[in-house]
């Protein structure tokens, strides 16, 4: 009996033990499920994408992106990208805000990761006919990987300065003017000047037109901003440049707009400019026209060193220029933007004498320009953007110097320089030179994702020159200039990398430069017939620029480039009357590095504080210089040799208060001749390791500006005291 009871108890204990194990398993599974649920609920969904302008498609910097399920938010980076994380929910809403744009809200169904691209529509505040749209383009440029200075509209608005005066206050930039309106000027960036500098208007190379249009011809009231690139030129600009580039961005006017301005200055200088724009909202067609008329007498008294300091009046240096154009732009066709432009440029500039009183000689030119622009986002493929430009320039220009009398400063009549006339050279001239140029630029950018992007740029230029000056040929007794052609092409492929939520940026570009020319050349030491000269060459270049942001305000920039500059048409094939062809001219090549530190802080009141330090080194090979020729009063371009540049620049500027803006900058640049021997000989170079003459090595600017809006009442007015 006892055994039976013991067995029963044993069975009962086993059953209890079994039930206990089952309960513990059940509890363990319950805890595991709860832990899994908690773990799953703790998992996050990543929401990323890009914020762009609904009208232009350009990225919007510093747009504020927030999620309904998360009280925190994030600002978009320099490419307009954002990335936020939220707890895994079935759905939520995304809110995007930016000053100057309508707030956008979007409902999202969540998964492991969601890509949401947002387009913001600008809000337009009409102030006496002026559309005010807030942009962050300047900040985007300043925080890019390339060394760059940006002159914004705030620095241009309300000033009577011209572009050259504004550029001269920029760190590392020197501007040399030979006189007043219409006179030649040379822009130098870090000691490299002239044709090494790329000149662009709205990212379009000036090319041949740079011989007839100067930056000073553009009124400052038509300019949105000026970008000064140092060393590296953006791949999307096309063409070739070594010292850097100046890109003038003109204003985008409101749908209905009329502007008229008149400026008067010293030396009887006058400039009239006007802009008219109308828009048909239904069809999306925009019609615009505008023009600039410039005139200057440029008369003043001067002391002549060759006449023992005698004071005479400079009275034959007047300048007249007319620029006018019309445009039609469509924004609702298959292309996001399709624009056609027609432009006329006409110039007449008198020539002033120094040794003698020149009274009749002058230069003249007339150019007709037609241009087509096509832009399309998501061009047959999501993320692929097309930007296409084509232009054709037809010009006629020359020197007119055929007076049959000359005069000294006492008014005495002298014979001309040749039996056929002429005042200034050793020959008479009545030039009717013709030039034609076709330019095509195609830029295609493909955004793979928020980290990777590719860009292909193709730039082609075909230039032909047909010199015609029978009077000069008669005076010389032979023909010195001949028809010539030049073709150039630049192909660039770039890769952009963005990491660590936009803190790190890197842009690598590989380029191939191709050019060919066909001309004829004479041997001044013999009586042989002109010999045909053909040239065809290609070169490889590359550049890399990177930027890392330690904080939102402090960043490090570094860049390296090995570039090639193809000679311009004027350097390679001449101009038909004073510059001879140089078909054997070699392209300039450069290798350089830049290291910089930028602190850029936006104050609570919207003011800006900037401090930037840069160090740079550059080695220029086959430098091209303008030198006299054996033919009297003629010149040609020749390769000079090697030049080394090194230096440092420091700039500080900021809004001390809403009324006061201070700036100061300084540059030390050391340019040395590093040729071992004189070109074409084995003779040791006597100027080796000596500074290049006429290039300043120490530059400094400082100043203050007082700003006051609506000082004299009204709205939208800005008064500045420099």
Which residues fall in each region the model found?
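Short, acidic, small-residue-rich periplasmic hinge/interaction motif at the N-terminus
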Residues: 50-56, 64-68, 97-101, 111-157, ...
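A beta-strand signature from Gram-negative outer-membrane beta-barrel systems
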Residues: 117-118, 218-257
């Amino acid at each position: 009996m006892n055994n039976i009871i013991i067995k029963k108890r044993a069975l009962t204990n086993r059953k209890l033990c079994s039930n206990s194990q089952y309960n513990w398993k059940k509890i363990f599974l319950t805890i595991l499920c709860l832990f899994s649920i908690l773990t799953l609920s703790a998992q996050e969904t990543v929401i990323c994408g890009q914020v762009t302008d609904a009208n232009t498609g350009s990225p919007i910097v510093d747009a504020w992106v927030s999620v309904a399920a998360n009280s925190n938010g994030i600002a978009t980076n320099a490419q307009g990208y954002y990335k936020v994380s939220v707890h895994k929910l079935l759905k939520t809403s995304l809110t995007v805000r930016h000053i100057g744009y309508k707030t956008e809200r979007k409902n999202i169904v969540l998964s492991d990761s969601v890509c949401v691209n947002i387009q913001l529509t600008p809000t337009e505040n009409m102030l006496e006919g002026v559309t005010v749209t807030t942009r962050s383009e300047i900040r985007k440029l300043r925080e890019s990987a390339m060394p760059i200075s940006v002159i914004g509209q705030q620095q241009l608005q309300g000033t009577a300065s011209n572009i050259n005066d504004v550029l001269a206050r920029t760190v590392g930039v020197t501007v040399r003017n030979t006189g007043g309106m219409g006179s030649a000027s040379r822009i130098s960036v870090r000691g490299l000047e002239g044709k090494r500098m790329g000149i662009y208007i709205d990212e379009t190379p000036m090319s041949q037109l740079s011989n007839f249009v100067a930056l000073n011809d553009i009124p400052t009231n038509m300019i949105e901003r000026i970008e000064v690139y140092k060393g590296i030129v953006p791949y999307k600009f096309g063409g070739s440049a070594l010292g850097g580039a100046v890109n003038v961005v003109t204003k985008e006017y409101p749908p209905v707009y009329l502007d008229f301005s008149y400026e008067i200055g010293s030396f009887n200088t006058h400039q009239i400019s006007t802009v008219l724009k109308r828009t048909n909202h239904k069809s999306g067609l925009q019609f615009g026209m505008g023009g600039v008329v410039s005139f200057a007498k440029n008369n003043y008294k001067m002391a002549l060193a060759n006449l023992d300091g005698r004071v005479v009046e400079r009275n034959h240096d007047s300048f007249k220029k007319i620029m006018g154009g019309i445009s039609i732009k469509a924004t609702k066709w298959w292309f996001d933007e399709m624009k056609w432009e027609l432009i006329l440029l006409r110039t007449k500039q008198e020539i002033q004498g120094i040794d003698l009183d020149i009274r009749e000689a002058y230069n003249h030119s007339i150019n007709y320009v037609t241009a087509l622009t096509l832009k399309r986002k998501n061009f047959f493929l999501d993320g692929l953007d097309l930007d296409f430009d084509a232009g054709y320039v037809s010009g006629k220009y020359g020197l007119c110097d055929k007076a049959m009398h000359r005069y000294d400063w006492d008014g005495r009549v002298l014979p001309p320089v040749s039996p056929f006339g002429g005042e200034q050279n050793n020959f008479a001239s009545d030039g009717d030179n013709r030039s034609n140029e076709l330019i095509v630029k195609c830029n295609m950018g493909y955004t793979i994702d928020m980290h990777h992007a590719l860009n292909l740029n193709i730039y082609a230029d075909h230039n032909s020159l047909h010199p015609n000056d029978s009077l000069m040929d008669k005076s010389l007794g032979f023909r010195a200039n001949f028809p010539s052609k030049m073709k150039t092409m630049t192909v660039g492929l770039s890769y952009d990398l963005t990491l660590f939520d936009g803190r790190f940026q890197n842009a690598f570009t590989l380029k191939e430069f191709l050019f060919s020319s066909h001309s004829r050349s004479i041997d001044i030491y013999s009586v042989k017939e002109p010999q045909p000269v053909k040239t065809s060459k290609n070169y490889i270049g590359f550049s890399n620029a990177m930027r890392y942001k330690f904080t939102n305000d402090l960043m490090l920039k570094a860049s390296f480039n090995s570039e090639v500059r193809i000679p311009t048409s004027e350097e390679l094939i001449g101009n038909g009357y004073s510059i001879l062809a140089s078909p054997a001219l070699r392209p300039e090549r450069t290798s350089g590095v830049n290291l910089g530190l930028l602190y850029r802080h936006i104050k609570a009141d919207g003011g800006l504080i900037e401090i930037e330090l840069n160090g740079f080194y550059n080695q220029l090979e086959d430098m091209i210089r303008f030198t006299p020729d054996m033919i009297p009063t003629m010149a040609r371009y020749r390769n000079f040799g090697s030049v080394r540049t090194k230096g440092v620049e420091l700039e500080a500027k900021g809004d001390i208060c809403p009324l006061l803006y201070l700036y100061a900058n300084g540059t030390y640049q050391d340019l040395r001749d590093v040729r071992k021997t004189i070109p074409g000989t084995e003779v040791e170079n006597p100027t080796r390791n000596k500074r290049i003459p006429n290039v300043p090595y120490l530059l400094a600017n400082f100043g203050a500006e007082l700003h006051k809006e609506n000082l004299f009442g009204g709205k939208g007015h800005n008064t500045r005291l420099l």
